[in-house]
């Protein structure tokens, strides 16, 4: 039998249910725009919270209007409440590693075990006390039931500690009073007060320790509020706390039973009505049965609580305790210091996963592998633009980007603030668009693709992501680079640049000449040309061998800094490929225009972008209609604000006819494509020429 066929405890006992499409009548009053129907789920077996426990009605509640502007006192219960829920409970070594992590993060109250219930826990408490592992500003907390012998054993375990909290509890809920204890209210209250008296008695036997006490009416959410207050007040009378030595009353959602607002109402009611409130630290301990533990904790804190117990990444019984990481970083994301250090979230996660022997989910807030990752195209584009805007704002303010107010769409915090990099912020799959592709190419490969090239290349990646089976899988940065190289860098036919020699003009506005060795369909040949810069000269030279290139747009940038830095160049070009005419071939008239428009190159000083460039090239044999001294004009596109010429005005190079070429008009059909070419090289000149070659080869496909 395979794993998928193996029955679990539920299907084996009761048989697997079959999903049946809901087809019952709509509920009374259901609007016509809602097409949902009644299901066959046995909802009659459950009842509203107000019927199971009691309705909670709080007049003039204040918590909805409160803004959380400070951190609560935290208590980490990973070593007890978290540990008891593990498939493989922590060994002493794993416990110590967890304890040390919690101390380093800044937790000042740490529940370290249930020493009366486990020899392993007892030994661990003794170990950290005897080895001096507890810092002076950290208070350990130990858990015990209210039975006298368990309380005695608990105090023995903590002997010698500088300070300790003894946390005693008993369940007070309606359900547990009936089915577990089979006791009435007074009898259950007596369990709590007897436990409190035993704690006071034992504390007197160990005067070297600063003892504090915590009491939990366990299953508080299933307990009537008046009764929960009654039991807490009775315990308080025994402990006799003061504002300087307060008692902790912990109000756990041992089982989450209703919505967070109801829990918050109950906390505000208790905060208003507990006796001797100034001597009480009101604590929360939410579980996550309904998936709203974080909301319950935050609203309960706004409702008047002072302290929150929980576990890192929400470990704990069933669906877990409230997640201290989420609570702390929620505060951080709104500019409130959690007073805990989360600056290396991956180290925290690795330690927790090792100690608990359980993985942290990829989607777990703040710590999961995918929580700072966008696959959606629109999300990626917004993140990319947000990060760019941050850099521009930092430059404008003349400050470091890390000192700027964080404002990036879809990322509630800067991943770097918790030790992450931007490497995994954007990942590409079939849902991604140009923004994600552009981001990966920039951050992983150093290429700042022009916008139109982003659009073009993203279509290549989209096809890869969709795959032959249409699965929509992820495209890794390496796969993306391989696709880019194959598409833009690899083609070497029909044209391959071997080397070039450039003679730059001595005077501003002069003519640059180039002599280049190229291969055309594998045959090596030498070409030469002139222009207002190396790019224009190379384009002019290519026209002599049948490649008419009009440069429509051009970008360049350095890919990195340093002596071994590479440069990237991008050329958008209209490429017309016409092989040199063969003898007797009906060809091209000498006056037919070849179009080129190329912006001024970096380093070309003294020439306005609109200035014409004159190339005087000798007439070729058989060329009619032009004297050898007639100028050939190249003009680059108009720049913004340039007067007197539109960017769309035609720019022409009269290229010489080849031997035997006669009788072809400019209107004759030719192969012409507008394509992008990319070049990468140590020098920007070589990169720009490679970009032209790339464009020619892509046009030839």
Swiss-Prot record:
GO annotations of cellular component type: cytoplasm
Domain Pyruvate carboxyltransferase: 72-346
Known function: Catalyzes the condensation of the acetyl group of acetyl-CoA with 3-methyl-2-oxobutanoate (2-ketoisovalerate) to form 3-carboxy-3-hydroxy-4-methylpentanoate (2-isopropylmalate).
Native source species: Mycobacterium bovis (strain ATCC BAA-935 / AF2122/97)
Cofactor(s) this protein cannot do without: Mg(2+)
Subcellular location: Cytoplasm
NCBIfam families for this protein: leuA_yeast, PRK03739.1
Binding site for Mg(2+): 81, 285, 287, 321
Protein family membership: Belongs to the alpha-IPM synthase/homocitrate synthase family. LeuA type 2 subfamily.
MF annotations from Gene Ontology: 2-isopropylmalate synthase activity; acetyl-CoA C-acetyltransferase activity; magnesium ion binding
Record's protein name: 2-isopropylmalate synthase
Top-level taxonomic group: Bacteria
Further remark: In Mycobacteria this gene has a variable number tandem repeat (VNTR); in ATCC BAA-935 / AF2122/97 there are 5 repeats, other strains can have up to 6 repeats.
Biased composition (Polar residues): 31-40
Annotated metabolic or biological route of this protein: Amino-acid biosynthesis; L-leucine biosynthesis; L-leucine from 3-methyl-2-oxobutanoate: step 1/4
Subunit and partners: Homodimer.
């Amino acid at each position: 039998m395979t794993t998928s066929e193996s029955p679990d405890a539920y299907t084996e006992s009761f048989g697997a249910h079959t999903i049946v499409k809901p087809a019952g009548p709509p509920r009374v009053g259901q609007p016509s725009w809602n097409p949902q129907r009644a299901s066959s789920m046995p909802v009659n077996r459950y009842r509203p919270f107000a019927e199971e426990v009691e309705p909670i009605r709080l007049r003039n509640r204040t918590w909805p209007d409160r803004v959380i502007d400070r951190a609560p006192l935290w208590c980490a219960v990973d070593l007890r409440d978290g540990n008891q829920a593990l498939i493989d409970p922590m060994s002493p070594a794993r416990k110590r590693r967890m304890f040390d992590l919690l101390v380093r993060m800044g937790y000042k109250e740490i529940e370290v075990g249930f020493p009366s219930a486990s020899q392993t826990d007892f030994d661990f408490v003794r170990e950290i006390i005897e080895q001096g592992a507890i810092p002076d500003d950290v208070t350990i907390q130990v858990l015990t039931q209210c039975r006298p012998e368990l309380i005695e054993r608990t105090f023995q375990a903590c002997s010698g500690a500088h300070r300790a909290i003894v946390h005693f509890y008993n369940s007070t809920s309606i359900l547990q009073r009936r089915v577990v204890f089979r006791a009435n209210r007074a009898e259950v209250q007596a369990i709590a007060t007897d436990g409190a008296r035993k704690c006071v008695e034992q504390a007197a036997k160990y005067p070297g320790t600063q003892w504090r006490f915590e009491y939990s009416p366990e299953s508080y959410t299933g307990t009537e509020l008046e009764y929960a207050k009654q039991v807490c007040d009775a315990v308080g009378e025994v402990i006799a706390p003061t504002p300087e030595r307060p008692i902790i009353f912990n109000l756990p959602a041992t089982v989450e039973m209703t919505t967070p607002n109801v829990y918050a109402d109950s906390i505000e009611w208790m905060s208003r009505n507990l006796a001797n409130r100034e001597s009480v630290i009101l604590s929360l301990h939410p579980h996550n049965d309904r998936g709203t533990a974080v909301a319950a904790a935050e609203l309960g804190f706004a409702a008047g609580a002072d302290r929150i117990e929980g576990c890192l990444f929400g470990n704990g019984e069933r669906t877990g305790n409230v997640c201290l990481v989420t609570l702390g970083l929620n505060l951080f994301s709104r500019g409130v210091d959690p007073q805990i250090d989360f600056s290396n979230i991956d180290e925290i996660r690795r330690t927790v996963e090792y100690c608990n022997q359980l993985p942290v989910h990829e989607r777990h807030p703040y710590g999961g592998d995918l929580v700072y990752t966008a696959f959606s195209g629109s999300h990626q584009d917004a993140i990319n633009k947000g990060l760019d805007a941050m850099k521009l704002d930092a430059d404008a303010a003349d400050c470091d980007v890390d000192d700027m107010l964080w404002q990036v769409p879809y990322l509630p915090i800067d991943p770097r603030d918790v030790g992450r990099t931007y490497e995994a912020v954007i990942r590409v799959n079939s849902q991604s668009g140009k923004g994600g592709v552009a981001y990966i190419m920039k951050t992983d490969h150093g290429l700042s693709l022009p916008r139109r090239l982003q659009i073009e290349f993203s279509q290549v990646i989209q096809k890869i992501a969709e795959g032959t089976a249409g699965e929509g899988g992820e495209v890794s940065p390496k796969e993306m680079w391989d696709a880019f190289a194959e598409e833009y860098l690899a083609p070497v036919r029909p044209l391959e640049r071997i080397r070039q020699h450039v003679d730059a003009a001595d005077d501003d506005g002069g003519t640059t000449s180039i002599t280049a060795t190229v291969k055309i369909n594998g045959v090596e040949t030498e070409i030469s040309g002139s222009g207002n810069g190396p790019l224009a000269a190379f384009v002019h030279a290519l026209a002599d061998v049948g490649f008419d290139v009009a440069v429509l747009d051009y970008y360049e940038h350095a890919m990195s800094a340093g002596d071994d830095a590479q440069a990237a160049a991008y050329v958008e070009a209209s490429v017309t490929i016409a092989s040199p005419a063969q003898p007797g071939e009906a060809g091209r008239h000498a006056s037919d225009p070849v179009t080129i428009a190329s912006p001024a190159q970096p380093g070309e000083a003294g020439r306005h972008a609109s200035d014409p460039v004159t190339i005087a090239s000798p007439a070729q044999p058989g060329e009619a209609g032009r004297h050898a001294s007639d100028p050939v004009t190249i003009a680059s596109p108009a720049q913004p604000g340039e007067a007197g010429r539109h960017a769309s005005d035609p720019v022409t190079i009269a290229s010489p006819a080849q031997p035997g070429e006669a009788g072809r008009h400019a209107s004759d059909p030719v192969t012409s494509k507008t394509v992008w070419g990319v070049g990468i090289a140590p020098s920007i000149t070589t990169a720009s020429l490679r970009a032209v070659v790339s464009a020619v080869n892509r046009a030839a496909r």
